[in-house]
């Protein structure tokens, strides 16, 4: 039975983000949104615990400075509701669906609750199809599934957000689909930059409306933990609406680790006993509740790309380790590769995808990917010998393998459209067939005569040949 709405209660205690509210003869359901006024602002509190017959403990979705005991609170009778529909495209909303871009109210096709059941087994679709991103290293070695979940793993400052921006740019242009971007606990400056870059690159129009392709839902670093723990669900709700209308939606989360981190803060505030490394005891449940809703149905698909910060570059930390279980593909960014100046700094041996199977991608693609990985693996295993004894001690066969591996490493780099501003190199979208052809030719030794530098920061193999000719002419 639905809770009768507009029941009022009074605040009895405020401790940071935790607010206790006492109702008279009425108890709001867990996860209900209750509202109060804080100055001129609407403050939404989400019910987290029942403390007695008529008292609830809530988590605030905004700062609680200025709240006083005895203040009136109203039960809305529903979970947090956010606006959905094409009116959200090009706009920035917060966790409770209010616009924060100063462009007026959000035009919507109704409101949806942020807590919902995952689609049933019978509603889910299981077809395997590849999403071509135009990024060589991704398409060749760890291809993304349409309607799959992709994890972008990397420490601080190795290029996760830039890779996400490039994916949004490439897929919006090549695919024409809608995207939803959930900014969870990341830098406000990055969120602001992203908003303006979308307008400059034509992904969105200022103020939203016709021609906009991406809805933004932000709960940044400075927000209380309640907002950061729920903003991913608000973004997902917007994406689910598009999917249910038959769209193929891209859902970006930057950063899923902050979702876990906020959950851990909320858990501590509610007095739960922490588990391993101080994380919440409900870590797997929280992650599962979010991830199971990101799926493809017979109506449409949600392909999700999730940036996953890896604390201290330790992949065995419970937060990234719990995320691994849900993913179809992983793109691991490696600091050692970014230090060589190779961007995107994707680790070709650590990144995986369940789509890399001859039954899905075909024999030629599969064999080329495996050849590339074998050459790189051989180079990796020889690195200790090279470091101690030098290249001269290697056999002729090994010398050739190392030379090819170094060319492959450089050919895995690529100029990005979204990085044009600070690299000066125009971005490249490389078709899958060109990617396969180029890497196969390098592995087979057709370009052994070209210098390594020719393969650095180019798109197709033809561009590498051109660059090689230029370098030869300059050296002459």
From Swiss-Prot:
SMART domains given in the database record: AAA
What are the protein's UniProt keywords? ATP synthesis, ATP-binding, Cell inner membrane, Cell membrane, CF(1), Hydrogen ion transport, Ion transport, Membrane, Nucleotide-binding, Translocase, Transport
Q: How does it sit in the membrane?
A: Peripheral membrane protein
Q: How does it assemble?
A: F-type ATPases have 2 components, CF(1) - the catalytic core - and CF(0) - the membrane proton channel. CF(1) has five subunits: alpha(3), beta(3), gamma(1), delta(1), epsilon(1). CF(0) has four main subunits: a(1), b(1), b'(1) and c(9-12).
Protein name per Swiss-Prot or TrEMBL: ATP synthase subunit beta
Compartment list:
Cell inner membrane
Origin organism of this chain? Rhodopseudomonas palustris (strain BisB18)
UniProt-recorded Gene Ontology molecular function terms: ATP binding; ATP hydrolysis activity; proton-transporting ATP synthase activity, rotational mechanism
4Fe-4S as a keyword of this entry, yes or no, is no
Q: Which InterPro entries match?
A: AAA+_ATPase, ATP-synt_VA_C, ATP_synth_F1_bsu, ATPase_a/bsu_AS, ATPase_alpha/beta_chains, ATPase_F1/V1/A1_a/bsu_N, ATPase_F1/V1/A1_a/bsu_N_sf, ATPase_F1/V1/A1_a/bsu_nucl-bd
Entry binding sites for ATP = 154-161
């Amino acid at each position: 039975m639905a809770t009768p709405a507009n029941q009022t209660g009074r605040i009895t205690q405020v401790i940071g983000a935790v607010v206790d509210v006492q109702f008279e003869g009425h108890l709001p359901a867990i996860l209900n949104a209750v509202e109060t006024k804080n100055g001129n602002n609407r403050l939404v509190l989400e019910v987290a615990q029942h403390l007695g017959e008529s008292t609830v403990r809530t988590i605030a979705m905004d700062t609680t400075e200025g709240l006083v005991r005895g203040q009136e609170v109203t039960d809305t009778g529903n979970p947090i509701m956010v606006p959905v529909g094409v009116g959200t495209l090009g706009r920035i909303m917060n966790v409770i669906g209010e616009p924060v871009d100063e462009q007026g109210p959000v035009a919507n096709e109704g409101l949806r609750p942020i807590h919902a059941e995952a689609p049933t087994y019978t509603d889910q679709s299981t077809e395997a199809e590849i999403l071509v991103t135009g990024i060589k290293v991704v398409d060749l070695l760890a291809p993304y599934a349409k309607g799959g979940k992709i994890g972008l793993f990397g420490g601080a400052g190795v290029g996760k957000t830039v890779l996400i921006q490039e994916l949004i740019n490439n897929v919006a242009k090549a695919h024409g689909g809608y995207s939803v971007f959930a900014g969870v606990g990341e830098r406000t400056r990055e969120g602001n930059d992203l908003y303006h870059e979308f307008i400059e690159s034509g992904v969105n129009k200022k103020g939203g409306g016709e021609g906009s392709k991406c809805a933004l839902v932000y709960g940044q670093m400075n927000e209380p933990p309640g907002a950061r723990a729920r903003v991913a669900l608000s973004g997902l709700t917007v994406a689910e609406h598009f999917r249910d209308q038959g769209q193929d939606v891209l859902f970006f989360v930057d950063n899923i680790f902050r979702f876990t981190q906020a959950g851990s803060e909320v858990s501590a505030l509610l007095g739960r006993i922490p588990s391993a490394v101080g994380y919440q005891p409900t870590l797997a449940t929280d992650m599962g509740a979010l991830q199971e809703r990101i799926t493809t149905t017979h109506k449409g698909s949600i392909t999700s790309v999730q940036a996953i910060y890896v604390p201290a570059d330790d992949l065995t930390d419970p937060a990234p380790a719990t995320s691994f279980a849900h993913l179809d593909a992983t793109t691991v960014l490696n600091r050692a590769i970014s230090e060589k100046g190779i961007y995107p700094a994707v680790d070709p041996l650590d990144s995986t995808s369940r789509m890399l199977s001859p039954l899905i991608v075909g024999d030629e693609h599969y064999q080329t990917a495996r050849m590339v990985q074998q050459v790189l693996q051989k180079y990796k295993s020889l690195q200790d010998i090279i470091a101690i004894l030098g290249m001269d001690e290697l056999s002729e066969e090994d010398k050739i393998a190392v030379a090819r591996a170094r060319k492959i490493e450089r050919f895995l780099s690529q100029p990005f459209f979204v990085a044009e501003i600070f690299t000066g190199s125009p971005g490249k979208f490389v078709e899958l067939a060109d990617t396969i052809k180029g890497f196969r030719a390098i592995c087979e030794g057709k370009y052994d005569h070209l210098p390594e530098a020719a393969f650095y920061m180019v798109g197709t193999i033809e561009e590498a040949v051109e660059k090689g000719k230029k370098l030869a002419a300059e050296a002459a």
